[in-house]
């Protein structure tokens, strides 16, 4: 266990062990599982209610299974033209056209909730270990950079496990309530969107862990994480409207690469090259913020 990669892996595995002993991993996984099931159940219920209204209004024969009418409407030329008008013929809409609406609803849920899940799981990890003395045990055995990377990869794997369990639970709800979706064909779609959302979560993980390196308590790290979420949302809104400002401020649009929200549309594309570009950008954001936090941490007295 003398190589850098081995030491990083040891820190990551220990992070898993600590999470399991403290039941933190179990609580987070069960929370994500429950929310995934609830969201999928409510989404399918809404689709079923809308289908009943459409069938009644158009005086059509009732469908035996939920989802048949929704899928037919989603693929209809009239609905496609309406969505094209509102989406402005965007590349994202062109790529998601034809995908099952239940899968798209689950994808929207994932991309909205993963920043909060990452905040709950990881925002205070480094600060807590520094405060309770766990960091001192490791920092006489590994370098600070290796310890930071080990924490990062351990938390990334924990997020992957929680999201994977949530994906299987959501698929179970689809099997029970939406047989028209053909469960065997729905599973790859749910797994695909879960992997893409995990890529998005990686950027937030780097940001939150980077912030956790610069404070001495978990509460302060959590507060900084919440401020970062709100600040990123405000920054994205500002960049969307910066085109109407003066030319000297229009250059701010080039700074959108620093915000995770700017890269997630690439993860909604069908093109593997676009998805790869988005994944690389998000990974770069993660390691940028992690490196900045680690740079401050190297100068701290632990």
Language model segments and positions:
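Aromatic- and glycine-rich beta-strand/loop motifs that create alpha-glucan
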Residues: 1-32
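Alpha-helical transmembrane segments of multi-pass membrane transporters/translocases
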Residues: 4, 117, 264-302
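Alpha-helical transmembrane segments of multipass membrane proteins
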Residues: 15, 171-172, 206-210, 230, ...
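Secretory targeting signals
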Residues: 32, 38-124, 148-219, 265-280
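Residue-level recognition of pore/gate-forming positions within transmembrane alpha-helices
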Residues: 32-36, 154-155, 226-230, 286
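Transmembrane helix segments
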Residues: 38-49, 218-258
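Transmembrane helix boundary and interhelical loop/hinge segments in multi-pass membrane proteins
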Residues: 119-138, 152, 302
């Amino acid at each position: 266990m003398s190589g850098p990669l081995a030491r990083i892996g040891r820190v990551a595995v220990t992070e898993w062990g600590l999470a399991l002993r403290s039941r933190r991993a179990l609580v987070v996984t069960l929370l994500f599982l429950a929310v995934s099931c609830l969201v999928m159940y409510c989404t399918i219920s809404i689709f079923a209610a809308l289908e009943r209204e459409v069938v009644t209004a158009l005086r059509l024969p009732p469908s035996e299974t939920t989802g048949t009418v929704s899928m037919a409407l989603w693929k209809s030329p009239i609905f496609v033209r309406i969505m094209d008008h509102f989406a402005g013929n965007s590349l994202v809409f062109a790529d998601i056209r034809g995908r099952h609406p239940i899968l798209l609803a689950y994808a929207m849920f994932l991309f909205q909730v993963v920043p909060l899940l990452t905040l709950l799981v990881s925002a205070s990890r480094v600060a807590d270990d520094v405060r309770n003395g766990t960091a001192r045990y490791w920092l006489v055995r590994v370098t600070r950079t290796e310890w930071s990377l080990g924490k990062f990869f351990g938390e990334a794997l924990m997020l992957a496990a929680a999201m994977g369990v949530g994906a299987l639970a959501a698929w179970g709800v689809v099997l029970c309530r939406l047989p028209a979706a053909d469960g065997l064909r729905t599973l790859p779609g749910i797994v695909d969107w879960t992997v893409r959302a995990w890529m998005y979560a990686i950027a937030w993980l780097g940001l939150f862990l980077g912030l956790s390196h610069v404070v001495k308590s978990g509460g302060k790290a959590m507060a900084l994480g919440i401020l970062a979420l709100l600040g990123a949302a405000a920054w994205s809104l500002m960049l969307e409207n910066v085109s109407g400002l003066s030319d000297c401020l229009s250059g701010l649009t080039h700074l959108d690469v620093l915000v995770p929200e700017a890269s997630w549309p690439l993860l909604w594309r069908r093109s593997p090259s676009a998805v790869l570009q988005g994944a690389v950008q998000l990974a770069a954001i993660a390691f940028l913020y992690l490196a900045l936090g680690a740079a401050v941490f190297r100068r701290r007295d632990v």
